Amino acid sequence: MAEERKDSEESPGTYSCSKTLRRRGEITPNGKVRYETTQNKAAGITKTNFFRRLVLSIVMISGFCWISVNDKIYSFGLIIFLTISIIREIIGITRKSDGRPFHLRTSIILGLAVPIYSYLVFPSIMMMYFSRVSKCFLRRLSFVCFYSYVAAFMCFVASLRKGRLKPQLGLFALIHLSTYTMAIAAKCAIFNLNKGRFWFVFPALLVISNDISAYVVGKSIGKRPLYRLSPKKTLEGFIGAFIFTTAVGFALGHLHVNSGFLRDADSEQFQKFMKFTVFGANVRVQSIYIHIIPFIFVASFVAPFSGFLASALKRAYKKKDFGEAISGHGGIADRMDCQVLIAIFASTYISSFIYTEERSVGSVFSLICRNFSHDEIMILIEMLNRRVESIRK
């Protein structure tokens, strides 16, 4: 009792100090001092989802930039790895609803998906890197892929069972949807890379900046949901992401033409000025900035719709994420859904407005050297000589 009275007779300053420390969390309610408050707070921060997303985002962006500035074969490998991983994750969301044994399901998926992907993607790489040795292989590739697909198709139809038709046919449709879409996206990304590193990296960085800024702005000031099937996306984040993506797009364009950022042999054409008349005034703008504008609009307003489709697909199968490959982000498909559409757009825009198929002497020469053997070139020279002699006569 005496000790309790003594404690109660503590000075007001001591009581105030104790109360302040307790409010700060440095003294627990039972009176013990917590000495590792800072460490506990730091440990709590490192375990948050935001911290994991931040660290992994930095690692992924750094890795992508390193791959992009090195030999193109690394970029080809990245494209193949990402697209195959996305196909696996999309098909994987039907795992519990299919009802087939694991070995039969896996065999059917590989039998249907591999021939389609191989037929659409591998010729693009073979013609670029192995053109001299791949002619015989490419002539027979379509034959091998077709009959491999037919065999898998027959096995799939034979394995259909009553009572499971809906999920089994859903798997069949999802295999074709994912494989065709990813194969086309991979082929377009390879095309973009061959036209210049900038046209491979630039669209991807636009989507990355749009995705990050939409998340940050939405978390900070977002109040109005943007899409009912994706409630975490907000209208404020959508608008803020467009503003930030515009700034990033013009900054990357400026670095490309003025600072040597991902410069290629054909980059000089984008330094040329284009003249416009705006309200009676003559305006001169470098052509790169004109080409950048469509990419900004597609990355900000069109590419997110592929993300909305991915959200709808996950909800249809009652899944939160496509996978758990990236901690804090979900699966690879959750992060790459918008990249698919921008890669396809980039290839169509490049072939339509930038590198049109107008043959020149230099392009024909490069084509001959890339695709013909020494003996075939000598035969071609003899044919051209005979043609020249006939014209002179």
Curated annotation (Swiss-Prot):
Pathway: Phospholipid metabolism; CDP-diacylglycerol biosynthesis; CDP-diacylglycerol from sn-glycerol 3-phosphate: step 3/3. One of its GO terms (cellular component) is endoplasmic reticulum membrane. Keywords: Lipid biosynthesis, Lipid metabolism, Membrane, Nucleotidyltransferase, Phospholipid biosynthesis, Phospholipid metabolism, Transferase, Transmembrane, Transmembrane helix. Pfam families: CTP_transf_1. GO terms for molecular function: phosphatidate cytidylyltransferase activity. It catalyses: a 1,2-diacyl-sn-glycero-3-phosphate + CTP + H(+) = a CDP-1,2-diacyl-sn-glycerol + diphosphate. It is an enzyme of class 2 (transferase). Its main location: membrane. Belongs to the CDS family. This is Phosphatidate cytidylyltransferase. It comes from Encephalitozoon cuniculi (strain GB-M1). The lineage of its organism: Eukaryota, Fungi, Fungi incertae sedis, Microsporidia, Unikaryonidae.
